[in-house]
């Protein structure tokens, strides 16, 4: 069994850790962006969140939806749906001994696709921008899963 120092010498794992940190930081940014838009537009989802703006009917007017808040929230949800599988499959893939350049290509394509997807979602850019970014990132994760299943797992 490999110890932590061996793992830290694994260039593919370290590349994965770097790119995983980037997409996780981006996902954390989306939480902050959602909160920013909720606060600046005074749009809340829960009654207790708008209690500082008054009570009763006065507070109820802040319980509403806003297109900008919903757009950021949907982009964040899309991150959750795509980054979590990338983290799990990417970790297993990085530990399976892939070629460094192939692994880095997978990681870079995924990170680039997710960043571009967020830009396309929040700007908003016309389709097929967002769709292409989504399918590129999804395809990268599928490619890693396929390579992992083909080369290292016994089915």
From Swiss-Prot:
Membrane topology label: Multi-pass membrane protein
Record-listed E.C. numbers: 2.5.1.18
A single GO BP: cellular response to lipid hydroperoxide
Heme found in the keyword field: no
Residue spans crossing the bilayer: 10-33, 63-96, 100-123, 129-148
Xref: InterPro entries: MAPEG-like_dom_sf, Membr-assoc_MAPEG, MGST1-like
Family annotation (SUPFAM superfamilies): MAPEG domain-like (SSF161084)
Segments on the Lumenal face: 3-9, 97-99, 149-155
Catalysed conversion reaction: RX + glutathione = an S-substituted glutathione + a halide anion + H(+)
Cytoplasmic side: 34-62, 124-128
Subunit structure of this chain's protein: Homotrimer; The trimer binds only one molecule of glutathione.
Role this protein plays: Conjugation of reduced glutathione to a wide number of exogenous and endogenous hydrophobic electrophiles.
Family (UniProt): Belongs to the MAPEG family.
The protein's name in its UniProt record: Microsomal glutathione S-transferase 1
Phylogenetic lineage: Eukaryota, Metazoa, Chordata, Craniata, Vertebrata
